Amino acid sequence: VLTGLSTDYLPSGCVPWQYILEDTDSYVSVYKELGYKTMAVHPYTSSFYNRKAAYPKIGIDELHFDDDIYALGEELGLTIRGRQISDDTFASAIEYYLDKNSDSPVFLFGISMENPQPYPDKFETPDIEVRNDAFDESTANAVTNFATGVSDADKCLKRLVDYIDNRDRDTILVWFGDHLPTLGG
């Protein structure tokens, strides 16, 4: 999405970031040339998918991963949902970094981490229960936990929209999923 490069010619199942070996034009680099601060927020390990090495090559200057979020834990109201840093904490981190850089335009690329697989028994107390006679117990648990994660993502989106609506700075929010869920397939 950030580079506009197609993955059609890459090996199936590969990690596209591993192919970013030199400076590569991207939407990020365009904003950087226009004077924007460029940053990424991802509440997971920096080595995953080679992000720490690849992001600077597409123009991202500031990288904030799980260790940064844990360090700001109290300030952000750190919570864990399932096995990951919650989407609510992810929203807090985005607000924190935007507020911290309110004196300049910012391009911030954020990737949440609360709702990836595995889904069975992910949340101790899911907010949503999905039952269907066609589902065995394992499938019902996976769908229930996935739906709870989607609900949390929806709350995160609403929180960010409300935050943006109350900012004194023009802000564009682009929200998308970067892959389909793996629900036992």
What feature does the model see in each segment?
Residues V1-G185:
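Solvent-exposed soluble domains appended to multi-pass membrane proteins
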